[in-house]
Design a protein with these regions (language model features):
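Sec-dependent N-terminal signal peptides
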Residues: 22-39
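N-terminal secretory signal peptides that target proteins for export/translocation
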Residues: 1-25
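Short coil/turn motifs at beta-sheet boundaries
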Residues: 31, 175, 207, 300-301
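Sec-dependent signal peptide cleavage junction
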Residues: 40-54
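Extracellular/luminal regions of secreted and cell-surface proteins that mediate adhesion/ECM remodeling
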Residues: 280-320
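Extracytoplasmic Ser/Thr/Pro-rich, glycosylation-prone low-complexity segments
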Residues: 52-283
Length: 320
């Protein structure tokens, strides 16, 4: 499994290269200190922050849903026929790891694998999490540290009435803009699973099911939750469904919740899309590309320390 931490910084300079040369010993030392400090310090590149109907997470993720005028467009791509089905029976156990198909950055860390949380409506990164059937407010320790929940509640499958019930996944698209689609098909409340009276009798609890997707987008690292049918037959799936994202960054737990049980509303409307957008990436605009250190070092006039700095930024210094 590939997990890659990111450590980046930003500084803006006008010149592409600068040669730092000082004649006296104190100035030589100061030149090196300044260069090293500029390269290793973390500076923030400010960019317009996307607006969100219900706010921004502590890490900087924002979300909008398709009910907003500038929100995402609901566009369902069904993968029941084309995708890989790996779960078709009721279980609280986890499955995986499965390949994402590309590197996906989430809360500042890149992942190439994911795990499924059984029939309970969540996925995790960095390790499996089982038996999390009761939804809590996000971020929730019950989901581990890094997770995406789209239909988190005590789920199950009534396969006898819904033969396509299960969890499917497929990576689609061309390199650079691929998508991982994870589809929960015909999810029901646990009490309506196979073998129960609700399932056996064909109750609305078993036949009016939930179908939704988690979509990971390559390059943009955005996340889309899509709900084809989010109004099931049971009070418990409509009211208890919880959705959001959470992860660890800079040693702290972060999370952004779209819905927790009956808050902010009892149900999610059918044919809804919810898009989570990460904050603008930090960048290394100033790079120390070469140094010149004379050997042996001395206080002589011609004993010159040199440092070449490359500007990878997009802005220029201004006089002042």
């Amino acid at each position: 499994m590939l997990i890659k931490g990111l450590n980046q910084g930003v500084l803006h300079m006008q010149e592409t290269y600068k040669e730092i040369e000082k004649k006296d010993w104190a100035a030589k030392l100061m030149a090196i200190v300044v260069v090293v400090t500029m390269v290793t310090s973390t500076f923030v590149l400010f960019a317009p922050e996307a607006s969100a109907r219900t706010g921004t997470g502590s890490f900087g993720y924002v979300f909008k849903d398709s009910a907003e005028s500038d929100g995402p467009t609901y566009a369902w791509t069904d993968i029941v026929s084309s995708g890989t089905k790996f779960l078709g029976s009721t279980t609280d156990g986890s499955q995986g790891p499965f390949d994402i198909g590309f590197d996906f950055e989430f809360y500042g860390t890149s992942y190439d694998e994911w795990y499924n949380g059984g029939d309970n409506g969540y996925i995790t990164f960095g390790g499996a999490v089982s038996n999390a059937w009761t939804p809590y407010a996000i971020p929730a320790s019950q989901l581990g540290t890094t997770a995406i929940a789209a239909g988190w509640f005590d789920g199950g499958f009534c396969v006898s009435k819904n033969p396509n019930s299960g969890v499917y996944y497929e990576t689609v698209g061309d390199a650079g803009s691929r998508q991982l689609i994870i589809q929960m098909q015909d999810q029901v409340y646990w009490s309506a699973r196979d073998g129960t009276s609700y399932c056996n009798s064909g109750s609305a609890w078993a036949t009016n099911t939930l179908t939704w997707q988690i979509i990971l987008n390559e390059g943009t690292n955005t996340i889309v939750l899509q709900y084809k049918d989010a109004t099931g037959g049971s009070y418990y799936d409509n009211e208890y469904l919880t959705a959001g994202i959470q992860g660890i960054a800079d040693g702290a737990q972060h999370g952004l919740q779209y819905k927790y049980r009956s808050t902010p509303s009892n149900t999610i409307a059918d044919e809804t899309a919810v898009k989570f957008v990460p904050p603008p990436p930090k960048r290394n605009d100033l790079k120390l590309s070469a140094t010149t250190i004379p050997q042996p070092m001395s206080l002589a006039e011609d004993n010159i320390l040199g440092a070449t700095v490359t500007n990878n930024g997009v802005n220029c210094d201004t006089a002042g």
